[in-house]
Each structure stands twice: as C-alpha cells, then as structure tokens.
C-alpha cells in the first residue's frame, strides 16, 4: 500500500521537526496538501496515518488533507484547464499535446500543530517524488 509509505514519511518528518523544537510532547494535527494527480487516496492515507502514529508523539493527531486540483496549460495556445481524473492531457481548445502541468502533483506538509498551540510552517522539501 503506497499510502502507508507516504504516512510513514510524513510521521518521520514531523518527528524530526518535533525533536528539533525540543519541548514538544504531542502533535495535535498535521495539514497536508495532496494533489489530485499525486496517486494518493486521501481516505487510505488517513487510515494508514492513524495506524502508523501509534506509539509516537503523533498518536491521536488529526491528518487534515487539502486536495489540490490538477491544472494544465497548453504550450501552443496558452489555454488553461482542469485535467480531472482520469487526467485529460490534450488541450480542449486546439487539441495540442504539448502541455505543462501547473498543479496537482503536490504532496507536502503545510503545517503542524504542536500541543503548545503554536503552528509551525513546513521548512522541508515535499515528500513526493513526483515533482
């Protein structure tokens, strides 16, 4: 299950950040951007996250996922569109196949909420191998 490896990577990054902060006793929530084209099922990720958090500083933490829609731009005519699922990667205007993906592959931690109430923005690179 791909989502389990993603959940473990998120937990590892948050645990490292918590260790660097020094005084964190519990993590309350993790906010994660998940692109529509990232190949991750948010419900499966939440399930895996809950299981993998057991016995860590993240035990009981909420995983809040924000879906980022897939968008593309046609190189020849500059038309932008939502690619949807399954992705439509040919231009609806001119039929061109030279497109740039503008969004939808994101898989990154946006913020972490510690028990002390402070919110810390992500300072690390996205965990996704799909850039």
Curated annotation (Swiss-Prot):
One of its GO terms (biological process) is protein modification process. Zn(2+) binds at residues 74, 77, 91, 94. One of its GO terms (molecular function) is zinc ion binding. Ni(2+) binds at residue 2. Keywords: Metal-binding, Nickel, Zinc. The keyword Heme does not apply. It comes from the Bacteria. InterPro entries: HypA/HybF. Gene3D superfamilies: 3.30.2320.80. Transmembrane segments: none annotated. Belongs to the HypA/HybF family. Involved in the maturation of [NiFe] hydrogenases. Required for nickel insertion into the metal center of the hydrogenase. PANTHER family: HYDROGENASE MATURATION FACTOR HYPA. This is Hydrogenase maturation factor HypA. It comes from Streptomyces avermitilis (strain ATCC 31267 / DSM 46492 / JCM 5070 / NBRC 14893 / NCIMB 12804 / NRRL 8165 / MA-4680).
